[in-house]
């Protein structure tokens, strides 16, 4: 088994991935600055996996902390989640995103190189694809100028890692292009708990259902889609976490840099998600239609054939499963990870 450094491991996707890593027998070190996460999530990770992990509170921009981690732990590979991810905020504060997501990633790989650690799984995004591409999106399609600055930072880091791998054959890098993670651990003890107003659909839906917010804001109902609302490929966070384990196992045995889409291959509109949530959970969700959000595209869903064929990965959970698990998490934890 390997020892894995997980940056951003206290966050939504990172924490679910830590459960998978620990349950598979790996040792885990988490580095997280807790800017959009809670240390309570890591306590629950260890309970659910019945195994301890090491936690370091700090930032990937801090070279000293990174060097200390690599000095004190015999790290075999890194899974890199740490970064800012709000599309709307990235349009308003681009420098903040460039520093955290691009400079932070450079800081991390420099520390990895100093420590002679060359195995990396990078948390990328389907937003790297040129918005002119027609879904289903596959990995051979051109990346292009993403429609928002968040996607731009992911694309730049992908390109940096590709060039790094081409220049130094010691590197083995997986670029996982996520579509839209939703759902929660089946125990109801882990889920998405954003700080402040949610930027993603599902925590907004569940917070309205549990009474924390009055209404859901749906951004745009004039897209050329089945009902005018945006269509996305929603994937269960447990399926996504398992994809990281599959990618890690693949990269531990191979060299080079390669991208994989991580999605179900099916698109659902925002209104379809809301109506399905109401049906599955017998809970009404009030909503308002708002103007389109800058940087959003009408339709985005994956061709996931490469990940299925090469990583031995297969998504297992349906949209109904995702929505049932999301609500199970929220109703058990109406205030998220806080105890009040």
Where are these regions (language model features)?
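Short, flexible active-site loop motifs that bind/organize anionic cofactors or intermediates
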Residues: 8, 56, 68, 80, ...
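C-terminal substrate-binding subdomain of Rossmann-fold SDR/epimerase-dehydratase oxidoreductases
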Residues: 202-340
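Glycosyltransferase donor-binding loop in the core domain
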Residues: 61, 85, 97, 197, ...
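Short-chain dehydrogenase/reductase
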Residues: 98, 147-155, 191, 195-199, ...
């Amino acid at each position: 088994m390997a020892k894995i450094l997980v940056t951003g491991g206290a966050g939504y996707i990172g924490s679910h991935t830590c459960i998978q890593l620990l349950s598979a027998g790996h040792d885990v070190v988490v580095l997280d600055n807790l800017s959009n996460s809670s240390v309570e999530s890591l306590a629950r990770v260890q309970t659910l996996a019945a195994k301890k992990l090491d936690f370091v509170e700090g930032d990937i921009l801090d070279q000293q902390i990174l060097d200390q981690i690599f000095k004190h732990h015999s790290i075999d590979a890194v899974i890199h989640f740490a970064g800012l991810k709000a599309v709307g905020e990235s349009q308003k504060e681009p420098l903040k995103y460039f520093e955290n997501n691009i400079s932070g990633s450079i800081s991390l790989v420099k520390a990895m190189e100093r420590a002679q650690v060359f195995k990396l799984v990078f948390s990328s995004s389907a937003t790297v694809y040129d918005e002119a591409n027609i879904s289903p999106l596959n990995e051979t399609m051109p990346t292009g100028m993403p429609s928002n600055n968040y996607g731009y930072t992911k694309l730049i880091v992908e390109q940096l890692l590709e060039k790094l791998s081409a220049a130094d054959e010691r590197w083995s890098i997986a670029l996982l292009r996520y579509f839209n993670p939703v759902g929660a651990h089946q125990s109801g003890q882990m889920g998405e708990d954003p700080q402040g107003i949610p930027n993603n659909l599902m925590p907004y839906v569940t917070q309205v259902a549990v009474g924390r917010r009055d209404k859901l804001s749906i951004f745009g109902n004039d897209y050329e889609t089945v009902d005018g609302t945006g269509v996305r490929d929603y994937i269960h966070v447990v399926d996504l976490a398992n994809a990281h384990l599959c990618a890690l196992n693949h990269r531990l045995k191979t060299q080079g840099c390669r991208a994989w889409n991580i999605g179900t291959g099916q698109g659902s509109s925002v209104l379809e998600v809301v109506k399905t949530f109401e049906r599955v959970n017998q809970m009404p969700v009030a909503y308002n239609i708002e103007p389109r959000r800058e940087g959003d595209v009408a339709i985005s869903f994956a061709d996931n054939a490469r990940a299925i064929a090469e990583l031995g990965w297969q998504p297992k959970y349906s949209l109904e499963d995702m929505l049932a698990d999301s609500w199970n998490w929220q109703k058990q934890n109406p205030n998220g990870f806080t105890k009040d």
